[in-house]
């Protein structure tokens, strides 16, 4: 704010106050600049333009200074509790069945169905209907099981990839890969990913089928012979003394073919009745 002498000197046309009598105000900027220079020079008597002195204050726990903060904190915690209580429960839905044909799994939540579908139905081989937990394992399975050129290429180079993602090692045989998985990646010893050999089961099935076919043929022959009133004599072979061999032996029959039945090229058609003379 200007001093009254300066206002009178500026406002009147004929000022009665001389300019030299006007008081000159102190330049604060110059004074502050001088103080800053003294402080930089390291003089201890440098006076700060501020009279504020920092002072540590201590308050009790129940002081009024913390009252507003305690109220806000209490309201904040109360809102959190009420928000947890007011959270709406997920809507309950009736049980539904998996839409994949042949799967009878029931679900009451959408999350359970998504987990089931991703684990069992997302990565499924279209040839053998096997399911895999990841797309990479499915691709390796298709390459090793259903690619006709895989075995030819495996004889020339390493084709069996490691099943762990990020491990790019390849092996000559599936046994080497299995040993690598057990030793390096701590897979269980009974882990199996390669194609299983079913030679024994296939042989047993073929043997059983042959036995069944032989029994059917024998039963058919016996029925035909009984219908034609054929005479036969039962001549069982002598039974050996050993019990194990006697259990495995079966009685053999020798048949007498009637004169009305012929076999061989150029003969009369079999099972034809005699011509009347």
From Swiss-Prot:
Region annotated Disordered, chain positions: 225-244
InterPro entries: ZNF511 (IPR039258), Znf_C2H2_type (IPR013087)
Domain of life: Eukaryota
Pfam families registered for this protein in UniProt: zf-C2H2 (PF00096)
Record keyword Metal-binding present: yes
Gene Ontology molecular function: any one: DNA binding
Keywords on record: DNA-binding, Metal-binding, Nucleus, Repeat, Transcription, Transcription regulation, Zinc, Zinc-finger
One cellular component term from this protein's GO annotations in UniProt: nucleus
Annotated compartments: Nucleus
Gene3D superfamilies from the UniProt entry: Classic Zinc Finger (3.30.160.60)
Disulfide links within the chain: none
Zn-finger (C2H2-type) residues: 96-121, 123-146, 160-185
Major subcellular site: nucleus
Biological role: May be involved in transcriptional regulation.
Family that this chain belongs to: Belongs to the krueppel C2H2-type zinc-finger protein family.
Name by which UniProt lists this protein: Zinc finger protein 511
Species: Danio rerio (Zebrafish)
Gene coding for it: znf511
């Amino acid at each position: 704010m200007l001093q009254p002498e300066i206002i009178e000197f500026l406002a009147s046309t004929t000022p009665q106050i001389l300019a030299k009598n006007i008081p000159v105000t102190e330049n604060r900027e110059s004074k502050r600049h001088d103080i800053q220079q003294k402080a930089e020079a390291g003089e201890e008597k440098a006076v700060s333009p501020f009279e504020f002195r920092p002072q540590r204050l201590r308050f009790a726990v129940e002081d009024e200074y913390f009252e507003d903060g305690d109220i806000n904190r209490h309201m904040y915690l109360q809102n959190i509790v009420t928000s947890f209580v007011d959270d709406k429960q997920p809507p309950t839905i009736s049980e539904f069945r998996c839409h994949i044909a042949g799967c009878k799994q029931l679900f009451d939540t959408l999350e359970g169905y998504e987990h089931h579908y991703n684990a069992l139905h997302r990565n499924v081989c279209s040839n053998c209907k096997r399911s895999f937990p990841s797309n990479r394992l499915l691709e390796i399975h298709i390459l090793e099981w259903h690619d006709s050129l895989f075995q030819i290429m495996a004889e020339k180079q390493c084709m069996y990839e490691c099943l762990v993602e990020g491990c790019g090692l390849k092996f000559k045989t599936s046994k080497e890969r299995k040993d690598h998985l057990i030793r390096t990646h701590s897979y269980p010893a009974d882990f199996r990913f390669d194609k299983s050999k079913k030679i024994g089961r296939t042989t047993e099935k073929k043997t059983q089928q042959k036995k069944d076919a032989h029994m059917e043929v024998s039963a058919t022959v016996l029925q035909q012979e009984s219908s034609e009133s054929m005479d036969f004599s039962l001549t069982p072979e002598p039974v050996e003394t050993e019990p194990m061999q006697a259990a495995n032996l079966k009685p053999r029959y020798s048949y007498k073919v009637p004169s009305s039945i012929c076999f061989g090229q150029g003969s009369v058609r079999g099972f034809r009745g005699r011509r009347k003379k």
